[in-house]
Amino acid sequence: MVVDDSAVVRQVLVGVLNEAPGIEVIATAADPLLAIEKMRQQWPDVIVLDVEMPRMDGITFLRKIMSERPTPVVICSTLTEKGARVTMDALAAGAVAVVTKPRLGLKQFLTDSADELVATVRSAARANVKRLAARVTAAPLEAEVKHTADVILPAQTGRALAQTTERIVAIGTSTGGTQALEEVLTALPRVCPGIVIVQHMPEKFTAAFAARLNGLCQIAVKEAANNDRVMPGRALIAPGGKHLLLRRSGAQYFVEVLEGPPVNRHRPSVDVLFRSAARAAGSNALGIIMTGMGDDGAAGLLEMRQAGARTIAQDEHTSIVFGMPKEAIKRGGADRILPLGAMAREIVTQLQ
Protein backbone atom coordinates (compact mmCIF):
# COMPACT_ATOMS: atom_id res chain seq x y z
CA MET A 1 0.00 0.00 0.00
CA VAL A 2 1.18 3.53 -0.84
CA VAL A 3 0.03 6.34 1.48
CA ASP A 4 0.88 9.88 0.34
CA ASP A 5 -1.13 13.08 -0.02
CA SER A 6 0.41 13.88 -3.42
CA ALA A 7 -1.44 12.26 -6.32
CA VAL A 8 1.65 12.67 -8.50
CA VAL A 9 3.91 10.93 -6.00
CA ARG A 10 1.41 8.11 -5.55
CA GLN A 11 1.24 7.62 -9.31
CA VAL A 12 5.02 7.50 -9.66
CA LEU A 13 5.53 5.09 -6.74
CA VAL A 14 2.74 2.79 -7.89
CA GLY A 15 4.11 2.73 -11.43
CA VAL A 16 7.60 1.78 -10.25
CA LEU A 17 6.43 -0.88 -7.80
CA ASN A 18 3.86 -2.52 -10.08
CA GLU A 19 6.50 -2.97 -12.77
CA ALA A 20 8.71 -4.95 -10.39
CA PRO A 21 8.27 -8.74 -10.52
CA GLY A 22 6.58 -10.12 -7.43
CA ILE A 23 5.31 -6.74 -6.18
CA GLU A 24 1.71 -5.55 -6.45
CA VAL A 25 0.29 -2.34 -5.01
CA ILE A 26 -3.09 -3.40 -3.66
CA ALA A 27 -4.25 0.08 -2.63
CA THR A 28 -3.32 3.74 -2.33
CA ALA A 29 -4.54 6.46 0.02
CA ALA A 30 -4.18 10.22 0.24
CA ASP A 31 -4.11 10.23 4.04
CA PRO A 32 -3.92 7.76 6.95
CA LEU A 33 -7.66 7.79 7.70
CA LEU A 34 -8.43 6.64 4.15
CA ALA A 35 -5.64 4.08 4.47
CA ILE A 36 -7.20 2.66 7.64
CA GLU A 37 -10.52 2.18 5.83
CA LYS A 38 -8.85 0.33 2.96
CA MET A 39 -6.70 -1.78 5.27
CA ARG A 40 -9.83 -3.14 6.92
CA GLN A 41 -10.65 -4.76 3.58
CA GLN A 42 -7.17 -6.05 2.74
CA TRP A 43 -4.07 -5.74 4.89
CA PRO A 44 -0.83 -5.06 2.97
CA ASP A 45 2.48 -6.87 3.46
CA VAL A 46 4.39 -3.56 3.28
CA ILE A 47 3.30 0.08 3.60
CA VAL A 48 5.13 2.92 1.83
CA LEU A 49 4.30 5.96 3.94
CA ASP A 50 4.72 9.72 3.74
CA VAL A 51 5.20 11.39 7.13
CA GLU A 52 3.64 14.82 6.55
CA MET A 53 -0.03 14.48 5.60
CA PRO A 54 -3.42 16.04 6.41
CA ARG A 55 -5.97 14.75 8.95
CA MET A 56 -3.45 12.41 10.63
CA ASP A 57 0.32 12.66 10.44
CA GLY A 58 2.38 9.67 9.39
CA ILE A 59 4.01 9.19 12.80
CA THR A 60 0.65 8.85 14.57
CA PHE A 61 -0.51 6.43 11.88
CA LEU A 62 2.70 4.42 12.17
CA ARG A 63 2.39 4.10 15.95
CA LYS A 64 -1.21 2.97 15.55
CA ILE A 65 -0.15 0.25 13.09
CA MET A 66 2.72 -0.94 15.27
CA SER A 67 0.52 -1.18 18.35
CA GLU A 68 -2.39 -2.94 16.65
CA ARG A 69 -0.84 -5.09 13.91
CA PRO A 70 2.92 -4.68 13.35
CA THR A 71 3.64 -4.33 9.64
CA PRO A 72 6.84 -3.38 7.77
CA VAL A 73 6.71 0.33 6.91
CA VAL A 74 9.03 2.15 4.50
CA ILE A 75 9.14 5.91 5.00
CA CYS A 76 9.14 8.02 1.83
CA SER A 77 10.50 11.39 2.89
CA THR A 78 11.78 14.66 1.45
CA LEU A 79 15.46 15.60 1.54
CA THR A 80 15.00 18.51 3.93
CA GLU A 81 16.16 19.18 7.48
CA LYS A 82 12.58 18.97 8.75
CA GLY A 83 11.93 15.84 6.70
CA ALA A 84 15.06 14.22 8.13
CA ARG A 85 14.04 14.98 11.73
CA VAL A 86 10.54 13.59 11.26
CA THR A 87 11.97 10.53 9.51
CA MET A 88 14.15 9.81 12.55
CA ASP A 89 11.00 9.87 14.70
CA ALA A 90 9.39 7.43 12.28
CA LEU A 91 12.34 5.04 12.42
CA ALA A 92 12.23 5.19 16.20
CA ALA A 93 8.51 4.40 16.05
CA GLY A 94 9.13 1.19 14.11
CA ALA A 95 9.64 1.98 10.42
CA VAL A 96 12.23 -0.35 8.88
CA ALA A 97 13.76 1.88 6.20
CA VAL A 98 13.66 5.23 4.45
CA VAL A 99 13.71 6.20 0.78
CA THR A 100 13.78 9.69 -0.68
CA LYS A 101 10.57 11.07 -2.14
CA PRO A 102 10.32 11.85 -5.88
CA ARG A 103 10.88 15.55 -6.43
CA LEU A 104 9.71 17.62 -9.39
CA GLY A 105 12.26 15.90 -11.59
CA LEU A 106 10.30 12.67 -11.77
CA LYS A 107 12.31 11.45 -14.74
CA GLN A 108 15.47 11.75 -12.67
CA PHE A 109 13.80 9.81 -9.84
CA LEU A 110 12.92 7.00 -12.23
CA THR A 111 16.54 6.93 -13.38
CA ASP A 112 18.27 7.22 -10.01
CA SER A 113 15.95 5.89 -7.32
CA ALA A 114 13.48 3.38 -8.77
CA ASP A 115 15.76 0.41 -8.10
CA GLU A 116 16.39 1.66 -4.56
CA LEU A 117 12.65 1.85 -3.90
CA VAL A 118 12.01 -1.66 -5.20
CA ALA A 119 14.94 -3.16 -3.29
CA THR A 120 13.90 -1.43 -0.06
CA VAL A 121 10.32 -2.69 -0.35
CA ARG A 122 11.58 -6.23 -1.00
CA SER A 123 13.83 -5.97 2.04
CA ALA A 124 10.98 -4.67 4.19
CA ALA A 125 8.77 -7.58 3.14
CA ARG A 126 11.29 -9.95 4.74
CA ALA A 127 11.43 -8.07 8.04
CA ASN A 128 10.83 -9.90 11.31
CA VAL A 129 7.60 -8.18 12.35
CA LYS A 130 7.66 -9.67 15.85
CA ARG A 131 11.01 -8.02 16.45
CA LEU A 132 9.63 -4.80 14.94
CA ALA A 133 6.89 -4.67 17.55
CA ALA A 134 9.30 -5.45 20.38
CA ARG A 135 11.83 -2.85 19.21
CA VAL A 136 9.51 0.18 19.03
CA THR A 137 10.62 3.17 21.11
CA ALA A 138 9.26 6.82 21.69
CA ALA A 139 18.71 1.54 3.59
CA PRO A 140 19.03 1.31 0.41
CA LEU A 141 20.41 -0.10 -2.51
CA GLU A 142 21.84 2.13 -5.22
CA ALA A 143 23.21 1.24 -8.62
CA GLU A 144 22.79 -2.09 -10.35
CA VAL A 145 26.52 -2.38 -11.03
CA LYS A 146 27.97 -4.30 -8.11
CA HIS A 147 31.48 -3.29 -7.07
CA THR A 148 33.59 -4.81 -4.31
CA ALA A 149 35.65 -2.89 -1.77
CA ASP A 150 38.59 -3.10 -4.20
CA VAL A 151 37.33 0.01 -6.02
CA ILE A 152 37.84 2.08 -2.86
CA LEU A 153 40.58 0.22 -1.00
CA PRO A 154 42.53 -2.49 -2.88
CA ALA A 155 43.10 -5.68 -0.92
CA GLN A 156 46.46 -6.41 0.65
CA THR A 157 47.77 -9.41 2.54
CA GLY A 158 49.25 -9.50 6.01
CA ARG A 159 48.16 -8.13 9.35
CA ALA A 160 48.25 -4.52 10.45
CA LEU A 161 51.75 -3.23 11.05
CA ALA A 162 53.00 -1.03 13.96
CA GLN A 163 51.40 -1.96 17.26
CA THR A 164 49.14 0.24 19.37
CA THR A 165 47.04 -0.41 22.44
CA GLU A 166 44.11 1.79 21.39
CA ARG A 167 41.00 -0.27 20.68
CA ILE A 168 38.23 0.47 18.19
CA VAL A 169 34.84 -0.96 17.27
CA ALA A 170 33.51 -1.11 13.69
CA ILE A 171 29.77 -1.72 13.24
CA GLY A 172 27.86 -2.35 10.01
CA THR A 173 24.10 -2.61 9.60
CA SER A 174 21.20 -1.93 7.23
CA THR A 175 17.46 -2.68 7.40
CA GLY A 176 16.36 -2.48 11.04
CA GLY A 177 19.71 -1.03 11.98
CA THR A 178 18.49 2.32 13.26
CA GLN A 179 16.59 0.65 16.09
CA ALA A 180 19.40 -1.86 16.67
CA LEU A 181 22.04 0.86 16.91
CA GLU A 182 19.90 2.82 19.34
CA GLU A 183 19.59 -0.23 21.59
CA VAL A 184 23.34 -0.89 21.54
CA LEU A 185 24.66 2.66 21.81
CA THR A 186 22.27 3.78 24.55
CA ALA A 187 23.45 0.84 26.68
CA LEU A 188 27.12 1.84 26.49
CA PRO A 189 28.83 3.67 29.37
CA ARG A 190 30.56 6.98 28.76
CA VAL A 191 33.94 5.23 28.98
CA CYS A 192 34.13 2.83 26.04
CA PRO A 193 36.23 2.33 22.90
CA GLY A 194 35.92 4.62 19.90
CA ILE A 195 33.27 3.41 17.44
CA VAL A 196 32.89 3.78 13.67
CA ILE A 197 29.57 2.90 12.06
CA VAL A 198 28.09 2.33 8.63
CA GLN A 199 24.29 2.38 8.55
CA HIS A 200 22.79 2.16 5.06
CA MET A 201 20.80 5.40 4.81
CA PRO A 202 20.33 8.11 2.16
CA GLU A 203 22.33 11.32 2.38
CA LYS A 204 20.84 14.15 4.45
CA PHE A 205 19.34 11.70 6.95
CA THR A 206 22.48 10.49 8.74
CA ALA A 207 23.16 13.86 10.39
CA ALA A 208 19.68 13.87 11.95
CA PHE A 209 20.10 10.23 12.96
CA ALA A 210 23.43 10.95 14.66
CA ALA A 211 22.00 14.02 16.41
CA ARG A 212 19.09 12.01 17.74
CA LEU A 213 21.39 9.30 19.13
CA ASN A 214 23.66 11.93 20.63
CA GLY A 215 20.73 13.16 22.69
CA LEU A 216 19.92 9.66 23.92
CA CYS A 217 23.36 8.19 24.64
CA GLN A 218 25.96 8.65 27.36
CA ILE A 219 28.62 8.56 24.65
CA ALA A 220 28.93 11.29 22.02
CA VAL A 221 27.53 10.47 18.57
CA LYS A 222 28.10 12.53 15.42
CA GLU A 223 28.05 12.24 11.66
CA ALA A 224 31.64 11.62 10.60
CA ALA A 225 33.62 14.36 8.89
CA ASN A 226 36.90 13.85 7.08
CA ASN A 227 39.87 13.52 9.48
CA ASP A 228 37.71 13.19 12.60
CA ARG A 229 39.67 11.39 15.29
CA VAL A 230 38.26 8.10 16.55
CA MET A 231 38.40 8.51 20.31
CA PRO A 232 37.05 6.68 23.36
CA GLY A 233 33.51 7.58 24.27
CA ARG A 234 32.50 8.72 20.78
CA ALA A 235 30.77 7.08 17.83
CA LEU A 236 31.16 8.35 14.26
CA ILE A 237 28.44 7.49 11.72
CA ALA A 238 29.25 7.43 8.01
CA PRO A 239 27.47 10.22 6.11
CA GLY A 240 24.89 9.00 3.62
CA GLY A 241 26.24 8.92 0.08
CA LYS A 242 29.90 8.71 1.19
CA HIS A 243 32.25 5.87 2.10
CA LEU A 244 33.89 5.80 5.54
CA LEU A 245 37.41 4.43 6.06
CA LEU A 246 39.50 4.00 9.19
CA ARG A 247 43.06 5.33 9.00
CA ARG A 248 45.99 5.08 11.40
CA SER A 249 48.49 7.81 12.23
CA GLY A 250 50.99 6.78 14.87
CA ALA A 251 49.00 5.45 17.81
CA GLN A 252 45.80 7.25 16.85
CA TYR A 253 42.92 6.45 14.50
CA PHE A 254 41.17 8.87 12.18
CA VAL A 255 38.40 8.52 9.61
CA GLU A 256 38.48 9.35 5.94
CA VAL A 257 35.24 10.27 4.17
CA LEU A 258 35.40 9.48 0.47
CA GLU A 259 33.38 9.81 -2.69
CA GLY A 260 33.44 6.80 -4.99
CA PRO A 261 31.23 4.25 -6.69
CA PRO A 262 28.80 2.18 -4.63
CA VAL A 263 30.27 -1.03 -3.23
CA ASN A 264 27.90 -3.99 -3.07
CA ARG A 265 25.44 -1.40 -4.43
CA HIS A 266 25.80 0.67 -1.26
CA ARG A 267 27.44 3.96 -0.41
CA PRO A 268 28.49 3.96 2.40
CA SER A 269 29.54 0.32 2.30
CA VAL A 270 30.18 -1.88 5.32
CA ASP A 271 32.79 -3.87 3.38
CA VAL A 272 34.83 -0.71 2.80
CA LEU A 273 34.78 0.20 6.50
CA PHE A 274 35.60 -3.34 7.65
CA ARG A 275 38.47 -3.74 5.20
CA SER A 276 39.98 -0.45 6.34
CA ALA A 277 39.57 -1.51 9.98
CA ALA A 278 41.31 -4.82 9.28
CA ARG A 279 44.21 -2.95 7.75
CA ALA A 280 44.50 -0.10 10.24
CA ALA A 281 43.64 -1.81 13.52
CA GLY A 282 44.12 -5.56 13.06
CA SER A 283 43.77 -7.36 16.40
CA ASN A 284 42.91 -4.11 18.19
CA ALA A 285 39.50 -4.03 16.51
CA LEU A 286 36.11 -5.55 17.23
CA GLY A 287 33.88 -5.98 14.17
CA ILE A 288 30.11 -6.28 14.53
CA ILE A 289 27.64 -6.97 11.74
CA MET A 290 23.96 -6.55 12.52
CA THR A 291 20.53 -6.75 10.94
CA GLY A 292 20.22 -6.04 7.23
CA MET A 293 19.44 -7.49 3.83
CA GLY A 294 22.10 -8.65 1.39
CA ASP A 295 25.77 -9.44 1.91
CA ASP A 296 27.48 -6.08 2.40
CA GLY A 297 30.02 -6.49 5.19
CA ALA A 298 30.32 -10.28 4.99
CA ALA A 299 33.62 -10.23 3.09
CA GLY A 300 34.95 -7.36 5.19
CA LEU A 301 34.15 -9.07 8.49
CA LEU A 302 36.09 -12.11 7.33
CA GLU A 303 39.04 -9.86 6.49
CA MET A 304 38.86 -8.39 9.98
CA ARG A 305 38.87 -11.85 11.54
CA GLN A 306 41.79 -12.93 9.39
CA ALA A 307 43.66 -9.80 10.55
CA GLY A 308 43.24 -10.87 14.17
CA ALA A 309 40.14 -8.88 15.13
CA ARG A 310 37.33 -10.24 17.24
CA THR A 311 34.16 -10.48 15.16
CA ILE A 312 30.49 -10.81 16.05
CA ALA A 313 27.32 -11.38 14.03
CA GLN A 314 23.84 -10.66 15.35
CA ASP A 315 21.69 -13.76 15.79
CA GLU A 316 18.63 -14.53 13.69
CA HIS A 317 16.10 -14.23 16.50
CA THR A 318 16.87 -10.58 17.25
CA SER A 319 17.54 -9.46 13.65
CA ILE A 320 14.82 -7.58 11.78
CA VAL A 321 16.30 -9.00 8.55
CA PHE A 322 18.77 -11.87 8.93
CA GLY A 323 20.66 -11.28 5.69
CA MET A 324 24.01 -9.60 6.29
CA PRO A 325 24.72 -11.50 9.54
CA LYS A 326 23.71 -14.79 7.95
CA GLU A 327 26.07 -14.28 5.02
CA ALA A 328 28.93 -13.28 7.33
CA ILE A 329 28.40 -16.44 9.39
CA LYS A 330 28.20 -18.55 6.24
CA ARG A 331 31.58 -17.22 5.02
CA GLY A 332 33.27 -17.83 8.36
CA GLY A 333 33.65 -14.17 9.25
CA ALA A 334 32.03 -14.31 12.69
CA ASP A 335 33.77 -15.94 15.62
CA ARG A 336 30.72 -15.30 17.83
CA ILE A 337 26.96 -15.06 17.24
CA LEU A 338 25.12 -12.98 19.82
CA PRO A 339 21.66 -11.52 20.43
CA LEU A 340 21.30 -7.78 20.15
CA GLY A 341 20.92 -7.35 23.90
CA ALA A 342 24.42 -8.75 24.51
CA MET A 343 26.27 -6.45 22.09
CA ALA A 344 26.91 -3.50 24.42
CA ARG A 345 28.27 -5.72 27.17
CA GLU A 346 30.50 -7.46 24.65
CA ILE A 347 31.89 -4.14 23.41
CA VAL A 348 32.90 -3.18 26.94
CA THR A 349 34.24 -6.54 28.13
CA GLN A 350 36.02 -7.76 25.00
CA LEU A 351 37.99 -4.58 24.48
CA GLN A 352 39.12 -3.89 28.03
Curated annotation (Swiss-Prot):
> Gene encoding this chain?
cheB2
Q: Where is the Response regulatory domain?
A: 1-116
What's this protein's family per the entry?
Belongs to the CheB family.
- One GO BP annotation of this record: regulation of DNA-templated transcription
Name under which the protein is recorded? Protein-glutamate methylesterase/protein-glutamine glutaminase 2
Which InterPro entries does this one have?
Answer: CheB-like, CheB_C, CheY-like_superfamily, Sig_transdc_resp-reg_Me-estase, Sig_transdc_resp-reg_receiver
First-level EC class: hydrolase
Q: What is a GO molecular function of this protein?
A: protein-glutamine glutaminase activity
Organism, by scientific name, is Xanthomonas campestris pv. campestris (strain ATCC 33913 / DSM 3586 / NCPPB 528 / LMG 568 / P 25)
Q: Could you name the domain of life of the organism this protein comes from? A: Bacteria
